Amino acid sequence: MEKIKCTIERITFQNPENGYSVLQTTIKGYREEQTVVGIFHEVTVGAVLTVEGNWHVDKRYGRQFAAEKWTEELPADIIGIEKYLGSGLVKGIGPKMAKLIVKHFGLETFEVIENDADRLLEVPGIGKGRVGKIRDSWEKQKDVKDIMVFLQGHGVSSTYAAKIYKQYGKESIEKVQDNPYCLADDIWGIGFKTADSIAEKLGYEKNDPRRCRSGILYTLGKLSEDGHCYAEREQLVKSAKELLQAEEEPITQALDQMIASKDLMLDDEAIFLPPFYYAEVGVANKLRRLIETPIGKNIFDNGGAVTSDVTQKQGQIEYDDVQLSAIRKAIGSKVMVLTGGPGTGKTTTTLGIIASFETLGQRILLAAPTGRAAKRMSEATGKEAKTIHRLLEFNPAEGYGRNDENPLDGDLLIVDESSMIDIILMNSLLKAVPLSMRLILVGDIDQLPSVGAGNVLRDIIDSGAVPVIRLTRIFRQAQSSRIVTNAHKINQGTFPDISNGRTSDFFFIKEEDPERAAQEIVNIVRNRIPKAYHVSSNDIQVLAPMQRSVVGATNLNIALQEAINPVGDCLSRGGFKYRRGDRVMQIRNNYDKDVFNGDIGMVEHVDTEERTLTVSFDGHSIEYEDSELDELTLAYATTIHKSQGSEYPVVVMPLLMTHFVMLQRNLVYTGITRAKKLCIIVGTTKALAYAIHNMVVLKRNTRLKERLTDKSNKQYE
């Protein structure tokens, strides 16, 4: 292999998933810039690299240096020092401040920061606070760089090196060498495969018990990401064996040890991760106890009279027989489910239930899984609705403030968008519901199930353990909406009306070519809808069936940002640039910041000096450091899965055969029902027909239904 020393001038391409990059560099002895390609996680312009590899000639792109391994050095010239300091690696120094510091100290800049940081006070604009921040950051970077050199050859980016340092401190290298699989357990974003790559290079055997244990946990974790609460023992061993390429005996030995130590829970032949097992057991036990607890006799006896009184007072609201039955059933039940599609009167029925319980002097709590769903519930009822996390008074230090020891205070809890609630969240919610309280779960059972593990609402309905009211009639005011009528047609397996009338709220634009479809979507969002309907682009949401492909959410986000918000100071991470005015989404729960997976906000400030980003989530400003930007993604486009519980004035949805692996009836139904005023599909009738007739929905491995239907009346443990 040949060794070169180069300075990065431009990064012309970088794959955020695997780190493959194309760098334009200057190399001593070459007049023109040279192309260097390889795996370069999180390198910055101005960095000086020593790279080992080989020159070759690419048929399309010409002469390139293909990197096998590399290390980063501190630059030795003025321009390089300035670029390095301004890259964001050193907290407290951005591009402008870097110019001032280097102008003052020249080639001595690094020596000053290293040995006499107080001299930075000589630079105009630098105070004692910033000096302290720079000194601490510089020391941290030295430690992180040692870790980075160690991890670099194992496919771990500098971002994750910083997270590893934050988790383990100066013991990071020792910790990773001792058991690299701890990374998969402790560091968000580092999975089993990265940890396994490190372990292999450290000489771990394929049958090592630590490797088998981590592989089993990874397999169960991946299943939970697909919605499963457990795996059958035989299938788990088979899947782990395929993943690990190890012998079966050490895998079964590791599995038996984990069951014996209660690191995994065995229920017949079903193997659970403990949180999912205890959540299922907790939900089943609490629901059964609620159902078995008697209702106050006076309330039950007055149900019919109260319903009649409420309907007379709400004369402007038309209730049909099923809705009246739902109101009476709510008064006479401890637990009830109210389900129905768009336009069937779930909100009207909920209003009737609220009015009836208020007439009875009952205290009512309203909640929903997400901030947007809670806001919609508040607007529809005129009463305060909270997210489940806020209802339960969650704080990151102590967990849920409301629980079985400190239950909720009220008589009735109504939870909207219940199909979104996974088994873990439902267990936390039910712990806080006292036996004296009534519970009504409202939702559309035909939408996508929860993103998290479980199929809670479906299991409760199918168990027959609680009364279920199904609203099916589309009310007169909703019949004029083709969003509503087409959603119901799709849900019934019928092809929708796609004739594009001028007064319609549902349009289908035919386009077979994915690239032209993407261009058309950008044109629709930027030009056609704002001009025709006088709607801001902020009220338009693009919903894609998947992330990947030309018409996937990732590519559409880049194209839409370029069209809507192309210029301004920015911070970059994961292939995206974030600017003031960008719509962004939180993609993991961050309890410290009180923002949750799926929350959408707007970037209100970008500080390129401090390398921070401020995002407004419903009026709450949250600051992100550069290393935290992987918690965000652009949200001009998002997946239909991520849109659950939200409504948007306008929805634009690509639907082409390039999405075929995701084309299912409930996916398209969920996407269409997110639109309040206008829905536009861009794609092919073939893809739409394929989705409508594809009812093959993956069955989720859960045992909640069986626990609820168990006639033995035993309490699960």
Language-model segments: which ranges?
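Accessory, non-ATPase domains that flank or precede helicase/AAA+ motor cores in DNA-metabolism machines
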Residues: 1-299
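C-terminal accessory regions
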Residues: 599-717
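Walker B catalytic acidic pair
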Residues: 417, 443
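Conserved helicase motor core of P-loop NTPases
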Residues: 445-593, 604
